[in-house]
């Protein structure tokens, strides 16, 4: 194992011993805030230290077996050869596990998200494809037991959406969807195409982590223009009777968010403010993330909204993710919610990039 990793593990072990002592301290126990914080840190560190202790034991076993290779007894030497082989195999597995455990964790991975899908080039066909993408993510959310609620929608003239915004709530939503941001391209023959020519259209997807109250950006009310209007939608006794829909404009940046799905103006405003906070937070963090990704050439993690990340080719039944040169001939399954077929290889590639950087 590299000396840099050993140093990190030794430092972590010192911290683990310190945490063990702190959690037994009466003063800490009486302070629930500190006790909870130390308990969370202990729970994160303990599995790493357990693995490290196991690695050191196997390392000691290896050194003992290697010493027996010089023994005069041929039976002992033969036994030692097998023990050396087994110990080396175990060390490879334990080192790999420790490296993964030491990877920096994205603090946003456990968060809910705002999912934004917008039609780009391609007119009506792009709007229809936006609808296809939204159904794909909706089915994926359903498979994972997530809750999806539409915040705002602007339907296309011939189906689909010019724009649709949804909030997705559940376990590790951002951790799964964070690499879906970018330009998604579709190649297919539109229903209105009489000569069977393949058209190319595109949509952009943005996945924004929903900030919690502790990290939400403080927004000056003087920087906001708030407009109310009547929500549109299917008929019913509540439609068009109150100005429940909310449009908020952040004047310094020009960002506009709308929410019209709730019947309560108060709920729509709360959702819109949370979404605005997510967009402002994304503006602050994306530039830094892009700089890091460029420096380390982590194409998977750049999150550039203009970057073409994936092509859906209907005639060939093909989905290609251009960031990792992944091609799958399972278009129907993926559009039916089987997005893990693309997401899991992306996450694996990102982890491999992180491991490579860890060893630098």
UniProtKB/Swiss-Prot annotation:
Keywords: Cytoplasm, Methylation, Protein biosynthesis. The modification N5-methylglutamine is found at residue 237. Methylated by PrmC. Methylation increases the termination efficiency of RF1. PROSITE patterns: RF_PROK_I (PS00745). It comes from the Bacteria. InterPro entries: PCRF, Pep_chain_release_fac_I, Pep_chain_release_fac_I_sf, Prokaryotic/Mito_RF, RF-1. Its main location: cytoplasm. GO terms for cellular component: cytoplasm. It holds the Pfam family RF-1. Peptide chain release factor 1 directs the termination of translation in response to the peptide chain termination codons UAG and UAA. This is Peptide chain release factor 1. It comes from Pseudomonas entomophila (strain L48).
